[in-house]
Amino acid sequence: MSLSVEAKAKIVAEFGRDAKDTGSSEVQIALLTAQINHLQAHFAEHKKDHHGRRGLLRMVSRRRKLLDYLKRTDLAKYSETIARLGLRR
């Protein structure tokens, strides 16, 4: 299940440079983190959903790649983003 339009708009407003900034790395990382957190609750109940778990692993990998890119290009934004999201990197 994906995030609602309102939830996405809230995340974009919080992490984006303006209301329509959906492409910046910070926004993409925040959206992926919200989806990952939502899916973790799903997998606590549905342990045998292997097809869904593959999608979750793809999201985690994509978020990791975006975090690596952000760390390589702008260390200050990287540190701020992981602190705001509560990621342990």
Curated annotation (Swiss-Prot):
One of its GO terms (molecular function) is structural constituent of ribosome. The keyword RNA-binding applies. It comes from the Bacteria. The keyword RNA-binding applies. One of its GO terms (biological process) is translation. It holds the Pfam family Ribosomal_S15. SUPFAM superfamilies: S15/NS1 RNA-binding domain. One of its GO terms (cellular component) is cytosolic small ribosomal subunit. InterPro entries: Ribosomal_uS15 (IPR000589), Ribosomal_uS15_bac-type (IPR005290), uS15_NS1_RNA-bd_sf (IPR009068). Keywords: Ribonucleoprotein, Ribosomal protein, RNA-binding, rRNA-binding. One of the primary rRNA binding proteins, it binds directly to 16S rRNA where it helps nucleate assembly of the platform of the 30S subunit by binding and bridging several RNA helices of the 16S rRNA. Part of the 30S ribosomal subunit. Forms a bridge to the 50S subunit in the 70S ribosome, contacting the 23S rRNA. Belongs to the universal ribosomal protein uS15 family. This is Small ribosomal subunit protein uS15. The lineage of its organism: Bacteria, Pseudomonadati, Pseudomonadota, Gammaproteobacteria, Pasteurellales.
